Amino acid sequence: MSSSPSPGAAKSPYVRRALRGAVACALIASIAIAACLIWGGPKPLPPLRSIGDPFKDVRFDGMPALRFFTARDGTQLAYRRYDTADMGHGKGSVMLVHGSSANSNSVHPLAQSFLEAGYTVYAFDIRGHGKSGVKGQVSYLGQLDDDLEDFVNAVQPARPRTLLGFSSGGGFALRVAGSPRGVQFDYFLFMAPYIHYKAMTNRSGASSAWAAMGIPRLVSLILLNRVGVRNFNDLPVLNFAVTESPKADLVRQYSYALALSFQPPDDYRTVIRSISRPAEVIAGGEDELFFADKYRPLLDEAGRSDIPVTIVPETGHINLTLSSAGRAAAVAAIQRLDNRFDHRN
């Protein structure tokens, strides 16, 4: 008398087939991700003159020497302090965050304008730029947030404190403003801030002339980070259209970790809604990288009609921080914030 096969035995060929299919899919996915990591990086770009040329006529007279503070990982990070015996006292402090690939030199004219208006000014070499750490690199996602907190704790800038960011630095300032760490500051000023590549303010064609993104590598790293694999976060995902001038000391590439740390998260609308301190936005009417007239509807869409937007006419992206009109608009914005909210008590 023959025995019939057990249900488990009958199903075993299907189980084995499913397992083989799963292994094959995993192998194919692994090969695809590996290929994207190796060959899916950003392409090189020729220098973008509209970004580099405005600095040719900038004078750096009176730029203070670099100082350093120690971050929690022991790294010495650079900044400049603008302060004299008869200026820069009594009105609080302004902390300047430069744009992508740049350093504290790039905001020198803006720093001078705030010093002349009576503020103590701090200009950062954000980690991964200038003389702060390894160019184009941070050690982990979110390290820039930790660095800023370490700076405030170490230096104790005078209150009221304003965090001002320009371009990518404006996106970083926005990131801080909408986080629990925003309470370290009294005001925020975002100058032509980079919000997100999907934001309505982004000129996709113009922005791609300045920064080339390695999409295949970026997507692969996002997927790997979702499953806890962070071993490859030091790979470059952005190339910038910078000049080769040693004097400029610019950063050509950003790693995945730095690129994501120096901008708002994907849910930027929630970040905007979460800003708990007074803030303003300034943009140049002729900005080549971002749509200046879209900042107002973007803020309104996020429910922040209370955040004013100032458009400086006939002013491009870089010239917003270099021209007398752009610098005057920035000083006026912080003076307005001072008049509306008194944090000196």
Residue ranges: model-predicted function:
Residues N103-S104, H129-V155, P160:
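Catalytic nucleophile-loop/oxyanion-hole region of alpha/beta-hydrolase
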Residues A111-G133:
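Conserved alpha/beta-hydrolase
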Residues L189-A199:
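Active-site nucleophile loop of the alpha/beta-hydrolase fold
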Residues Y268, R277, E288-D300:
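Short alpha-helix in the alpha/beta-hydrolase fold that links the catalytic acid
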Residues I275, V281-A283:
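Short beta-strand/loop motif that positions the catalytic acidic residue
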Residues T315-A325:
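Catalytic histidine-centered segment of alpha/beta-hydrolase-like enzymes
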